[in-house]
Design a protein with these regions (language model features):
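Mature, structured domains of secreted/extracytosolic soluble proteins
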Residues: 2-7, 21-192
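C-terminal motif of bacterial Sec signal peptides marking the signal peptidase cleavage site
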Residues: 16-19
Length: 192
């Protein structure tokens, strides 16, 4: 797995964001100077995905997973990356013991695969996603950093992501701009 793919995975895993809202829905979470707030923590558009994620009280599990997977340097790189960042509550929905098992050194490759499944190369905004979905007749395929596909669709004004196993996640906060990409917060963990 090359460094760009690992970086993408790290961003996705660390932020674990799922489900994108349209730009109208996300506007309440952004100040006039471009600073967004995730879990009450300021996310500065001049900082990297990792530099911002470590301050989010809602993404402690993701940050720990990105660290365990060895993806910090990748997601701190120039990118750009689109990270779908699951919250701590999203990780808590997984079966008991899953996170504890995944962060063990012997499961690093599996963890990297899951995290990079949450990363799409390039900067894909909520507006880009909704346009892709509209142009695709209600669905859009996104190729992730691990090479697998996510399917994006809309439910009202909320972007939904469907993983390879049929699991769904909603984007609960979209367009959290970073110096090396964009984060969209998710309410469920996606599985390749």
């Amino acid at each position: 797995m090359n460094k760009n793919l690992i970086t993408s995975a790290l961003l996705a895993g660390s932020l674990a964001l799922g489900g994108c809202m349209t730009s109208t829905a996300m506007s309440d979470d952004m100040s006039a100077n471009g600073v967004s707030y995730v879990g009450g923590a300021a996310m500065y558009p001049t900082k990297t995905i990792v530099a911002n994620a470590v301050n989010s009280p809602d993404h402690k599990t993701l940050v720990a997973a990105v660290t365990a997977a060895g993806l910090v340097d990748t997601l701190s790189g120039t990118g750009p990356f689109t990270v779908f960042a699951p919250t701590d509550a999203a990780f808590a929905k997984l079966p008991a013991g899953t996170v504890e098992t995944l962060v063990k050194p012997e499961n690093k490759t599996t963890l990297q695969s899951i995290l990079t499944y949450h990363v799409v190369p390039g900067r894909v905004t909520a507006s880009d996603l909704t346009t892709m979905i509209r142009d695709g007749g209600g669905r859009a395929s996104l190729t992730t950093a691990n090479g697998a596909t996510l399917t994006a669709s809309m439910m009202g004004d909320v972007v939904m992501l469907t993983d390879a196993k049929g699991g769904m996640s909603h984007v609960t906060q979209a367009d959290v701009m970073q110096s090396n990409g964009v984060i969209h917060v998710l309410d469920s963990v996606l599985m390749p």
